[in-house]
C-alpha cells in the first residue's frame, strides 16, 4: 500500500510505471511526414493494453469496463503481436459456449414489450452454439448476439497464426456457432440472415426477422472461411461452400439496388417485403 512506502520506494514505483508506459507507447511506431499521424501507434497500443484483463478483453477501458466477448476488443491482439492474449481470449470464450439444449422455443420477453428474447438458457437463442458474455461460464443468458463478431475475430486469428492444431481444437465450437446462426437468424432458409443486437453500431439494431445485409455478409465470410479450414484439417467443406454461395446469391439477387449502385440495409420479412434503401454506414 502507498501509505506504508517510503518516498524512495514511491519514486522507484513511478519510474517503473513510466518506463512500462513508454515501452508500451513505442510498441508500434509510425514514421510519416505527418507528426500527428505518427502518434497513432502509441495511442493504439496504450488503448489496446487498457482493455486487456486476463483471460479476456473488456468492452471498454473506462466506460463499460466489463467482459463482453466481442464487437471490438480482440481485433487488436494479433496486429499488435499479442497472439498469446488472442488465444487466451478465444479459448476462454469457447468454454462459454452453451452445449445443451440443442434447440428451444422462440420466447419473446413480455417485460421488454417483446423487444428482446427472454434471457433464459433453453430458449431458441440461448441454446447450443450461443456464447455467454463472461469467459469460462456457459450457464447464463445475455441478450446480445456477440457470436457473430466474436467468430469473425477468431477466424481472422486463424489467418494470422496458421495454427492448425488450434483450428482443430476449436472446429467443433465454430460448427456449433454456424448452426446456431442458421437456426436462429435464417429460419426461412432463404440465405438472408436477420440481425439482433449483433454489431457495435447500436444495441437497438433489430429488423423483425428481415434479411439484413451486414449479418448476411458476416455469415457469408464465416462459411467461406469454414470451408477453407475444413479442407485444411481434413473435414468435409461442402456444406459450408454451399451455404456461402447461397448467401452470396441471396444478397446479390434480393438486396442489390442496381439503379443506386448500393445494397439495401434489409428486406422486410412480412407484408410487401419492402427494401429499405438507405443503408447504415456499417453496411456501406
What are these regions (language model features)?
Residues 104-106, 185-201, 208-214, 218-284:
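Catalytic cores of carbohydrate-active enzymes
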Residues 19-169, 262-269, 273-284:
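Substrate-binding groove/exosite segments of carbohydrate-active enzymes
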Residues 173-181, 185-189:
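Active-site cavity-forming subdomains of large catalytic enzyme subunits
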Residues 85, 166-169, 173, 236-239, ...:
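Alpha-helical positions within canonical tetratricopeptide repeat
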Residues 1-26:
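Extended acidic/polar, glycine-enriched regions
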Residues 1, 23-47, 51, 209, ...:
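Mature extracytoplasmic enzyme cores
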Amino acid at each position: 500500500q502507498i501509505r506504508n512506502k517510503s518516498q524512495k520506494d514511491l519514486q522507484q514505483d513511478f519510474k517503473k510505471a513510466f518506463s512500462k508506459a513508454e515501452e508500451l507507447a513505442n510498441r508500434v511506431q509510425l514514421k510519416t511526414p505527418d507528426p500527428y499521424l505518427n502518434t497513432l501507434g502509441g495511442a493504439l497500443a496504450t488503448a489496446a493494453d487498457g482493455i486487456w484483463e486476463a483471460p479476456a478483453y473488456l468492452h471498454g477501458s473506462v466506460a463499460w469496463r466489463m467482459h463482453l466477448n466481442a464487437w471490438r476488443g480482440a481485433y487488436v491482439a494479433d496486429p499488435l503481436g499479442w497472439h498469446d492474449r488472442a488465444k487466451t481470449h478465444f479459448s476462454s470464450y469457447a468454454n462459454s459456449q452453451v452445449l445443451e439444449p440443442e434447440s428451444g422455443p422462440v420466447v419473446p420477453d413480455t417485460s421488454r414489450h417483446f423487444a428482446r428474447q427472454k434471457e433464459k438458457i433453453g430458449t431458441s437463442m440461448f441454446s447450443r452454439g450461443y456464447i455467454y458474455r463472461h469467459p469460462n461460464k456457459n450457464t447464463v443468458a445475455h441478450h446480445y448476439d456477440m457470436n457473430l463478431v466474436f467468430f469473425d475475430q477468431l477466424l481472422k486469428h486463424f489467418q494470422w497464426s496458421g495454427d492448425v492444431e488450434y483450428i482443430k481444437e476449436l472446429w467443433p465450437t465454430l460448427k456449433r456457432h454456424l448452426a446456431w446462426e442458421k437456426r436462429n437468424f435464417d429460419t426461412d432458409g432463404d440465405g438472408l440472415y436477420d440481425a439482433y443486437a449483433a454489431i457495435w453500431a447500436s444495441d437497438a439494431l433489430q429488423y423483425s426477422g428481415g434479411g439484413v445485409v451486414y449479418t448476411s455478409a458476416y455469415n457469408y465470410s464465416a462459411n467461406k472461411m469454414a470451408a477453407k479450414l475444413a479442407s485444411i484439417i481434413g473435414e468435409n467443406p461442402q456444406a459450408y461452400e454451399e451455404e456461402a454461395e447461397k448467401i452470396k446469391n441471396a444478397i446479390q439477387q434480393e438486396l442489390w439496388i442496381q439503379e443506386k449502385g448500393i445494397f439495401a440495409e434489409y428486406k422486410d420479412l412480412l407484408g410487401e417485403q419492402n427494401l429499405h434503401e438507405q443503408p447504415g454506414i456499417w453496411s456501406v
